[in-house]
Amino acid sequence: MRGGELLGRAGLALLLMAAGAGARPRPAAAGGQPRSSVVLVACDSLDGRLTFFPGNQTVDLPSINFMKRYGTLFLNAYTNSPICCPSRAAMWSGLFTHLTESWNNFKGLDPGYITWMDLMEKHGYHTQKFGKLDYTSGHHSVSNRVEAWTRDVHFLLRQEGRPMVNLTGDRKRVRVMEADWRNTDKAVNWIKEEAVNLTQPFVLYLGLNLPHPYPSPYAGENFGSSTFLTSPYWLEKVNFEAIKIPKWPSLSEMHPVDYYSSYTKNCTGEFTKEEVRNIRAFYYAMCAETDAMLGEIISALGDTGLLRKTVVIFTADHGELAMEHRQFYKMSMYEGSSHVPLLVMGPSVKEQQEIPNVVSLVDIYPTMLDIARIPIPQNLSGYSLIPLLCEQTESEVSPRGPRPSWVLSEFHGCNVNSSMYMLRTGKWKYIAYSDGFSVLPQLFDLTADPDELTNVAIKFPVIVHSLDKILRSVVNYPKVSSSVHKYNKQQFISWKQSLGQNYSSVIANLRWHQDWLKEQKKYENAIDKWL
């Protein structure tokens, strides 16, 4: 398939005949069968709700639809931390964020951390990685880390460019995100030239930047990334009639943490309905381009006859709000930001199955080990997805007992002025903040209120109490919030000292420079007071 040429129905039928779909070998049951190979495609910022109704009405995603037809879709998969590095740290370690202490985009896993891929290599798998990894410490911009460290300071500064759209090229322009396409090509070539000749099973990882928004160079140091960029080719895949314009509360009615997020993301100004619709449409077009890259990988596996021997997993590190709740980006526990896509197809994975159980990215680690028939460590936060994918009973698989009926997500980074913790179970989403007292919690009934417009925490105190009790049994969140508070201060002090005489000029010219330079002394004083 040429770059981004979409898998048509006829193409898919041929692909499956070539791959021998239907005659699928049994999977990771111990014994005679060879172990399956695995391909994991992880993109950045794809809203998981686009993989099922009604979100799937907004944009044509044929590769995702192909995986749904010949595999399993998880309807309630969540990130464990809605920002790049901490989320990926959870996925590569199998541990919750408070256990790895991946507090922000600068603080992830130590470079030598043993991941599931390291263990698979040790147990005889050939391993290969292409594209975005971003799970170790020390990356992302200076602005990004300083904004995270200073979120407790009593000031309010815009840290991003205003979200905007940019149309590039013409109807022939398929490869908009060129770096991602180069990595996709490398993965395709590796499948066709290397994987096809291997005598051992392999695990291939492809990390994509899309559909993360693009940098906005006018917005200062290392810019923010507030530009939704696509070409007419991809925009034609979007069904404009199906785009929902989100309802916004007035600024005065917003939860205080939401207001801080909206302000620092430069979203508290006026936006016309047309602007909001365009931001959402361009975002969906970027998702269509992402889907085409997934299609290239599936096609390469089909062309080489490897598809029937390979478990294919597609997911994302987090979602994208795309102007829901008067915000873009992630860093929020609302569905647009925290709900991720998760689809699996391959040997013995049930076809056309939709799983309602709540799962999260920490489940990838034990799942990978399960596929490779490697004993699963008992200390992991996640549980293998194999019992759900293959309809086995839990007792056959996990000595730890059944998977819990909740998932945990937490956030400690920039654009949010409090640590937050989300417990999702049944129809409820409970969000606790900071020490559990100083900021009011939120409770949403996702069945009655899928858009999360009505916080019912005051209406259901008994539910709040019971969910808070579960949350505290998983994480001592007041203590964690306090640790993050101390970490932020220590990191900031050592950064400030390292700059010496240059401190005032460096801090003034970070992403918030447009606001900072108006009242430089005031903001420096606020920091001194905090310290």
Model feature map: region roles:
Residues 184, 318-324, 362-365, 370-446, ...:
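C-terminal cap/loop subdomain of S1 sulfatases and analogous C-terminal strand-loop tails that border
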Residues 1-14:
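Classical eukaryotic N-terminal signal peptides for Sec-dependent ER targeting/secretion
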Residues 68, 90-186, 190-196, 217-219, ...:
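Catalytic-site neighborhoods of secreted/periplasmic enzymes
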Residues 45-48, 82-83, 96-98, 133-136, ...:
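Short, solvent-exposed loop/turn segments at secondary-structure junctions
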Residues 36-37, 58-62, 111-118, 178-188, ...:
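A structural signal for well-ordered alpha-helical segments within the folded catalytic domains
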Residues 52-87, 94-95, 121-128, 244-246:
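Short, structured active-site-proximal loop/turn typified by the sulfatase FGly-forming signature C/S-X-P-X-R
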